[in-house]
UniProtKB/Swiss-Prot annotation:
Gene3D superfamilies: Spore Coat Polysaccharide Biosynthesis Protein SpsA, Chain A. The keyword Transferase applies. This is 2-C-methyl-D-erythritol 4-phosphate cytidylyltransferase. The lineage of its organism: Bacteria, Bacillati, Actinomycetota, Actinomycetes, Mycobacteriales. The record marks R154, K207 as: Positions MEP for the nucleophilic attack. One of its GO terms (molecular function) is 2-C-methyl-D-erythritol 4-phosphate cytidylyltransferase activity. It comes from Rhodococcus opacus (strain B4). It catalyses: 2-C-methyl-D-erythritol 4-phosphate + CTP + H(+) = 4-CDP-2-C-methyl-D-erythritol + diphosphate. One of its GO terms (biological process) is isopentenyl diphosphate biosynthetic process, methylerythritol 4-phosphate pathway. Belongs to the IspD/TarI cytidylyltransferase family. IspD subfamily.
Length: 226
């Protein structure tokens, strides 16, 4: 596979309201060890040594306050109320990118080494790369009434993390073809019939979504794990 040397731009959609988290503020701005989740997520990208530029996408009313939180070389732009619109807004200011990472601000403790591994796969010629972990629980499919309709084979299931990495050309094409709202960028790429490569993720790259997640994240920070 040909080795790519072009710029890597990381997009960080940060418009989530954090309703399930139980905090009275956007999720990305919740305190985590004396700083925000967003700041920690951006720091991880920068510390990886694999990212050339970071673009953070927030609601329009938070653009200026977000800029004051982050290093001056981080680009902050206004995005949509949903993830899809935010990623599109980020892509619009990433014209220089050969590769694009899309990273959840709520995965604030993602190790820089995982980010670097995703980029390494892209530079080795992969067009779409996602970190994953095996699923510990048995998963059921259910209908609208809650009746169980099936039990997928657990050995074939994986929980997907971020950053998800793509060639910029492929991700732009996937978003151009997208209709409606998507929660997973790789899913849009799959719709094009493209192959998505998975690599082993990291337990600490979990998404901070519930109050219990936040307790765990704060405990890890307090213990010096991050």
């Amino acid at each position: 596979m040909a080795e790519g040397r072009g710029p890597v731009v990381a997009l960080v959609p940060a418009a989530g309201q954090g309703v399930r988290l139980g905090e009275n503020k956007p999720k990305a701005f919740v305190d985590l060890g004396g700083t925000t989740m967003l700041t920690r997520a951006v720091d991880g990208l920068l510390q990886s040594g694999a990212v050339d530029r970071v673009v953070v996408i927030v609601p329009e009313e938070l653009v200026e306050s977000t800029r004051s939180l982050l290093p001056g070389h981080v680009t902050v732009v206004a995005g949509g109320s949903e993830r899809t619109g935010s990623v599109r807004a980020g892509l619009a200011v990433a014209d220089d990118a050969e590769y694009v990472l899309v990273h959840d601000a709520a995965r604030a403790l993602t190790p820089p080494s995982l980010i670097a591994r995703v980029v390494a796969e892209l530079r080795c010629g992969r067009r779409a790369v996602i970190p994953v972990l095996p699923v510990a629980d048995t998963i059921k499919t259910v209908d609208v009434l809650g009746a169980v309709t099936g039990t997928p084979e657990r050995s074939e299931l994986r929980a997907v993390q971020t950053p998800q990495g793509f060639t910029a050309e492929l991700l732009r094409r996937a978003y151009a073809a997208a209709d409606g709202i998507a929660t997973d960028d790789a899913g849009l790429v799959e719709r094009l019939g493209e192959r998505v490569r998975s690599i082993v993720g990291e337990p600490t790259a979990f998404k901070i979504t519930t109050p219990l997640d936040l307790v765990l994240a704060r405990a890890l920070v307090e213990e010096g794990a991050h």
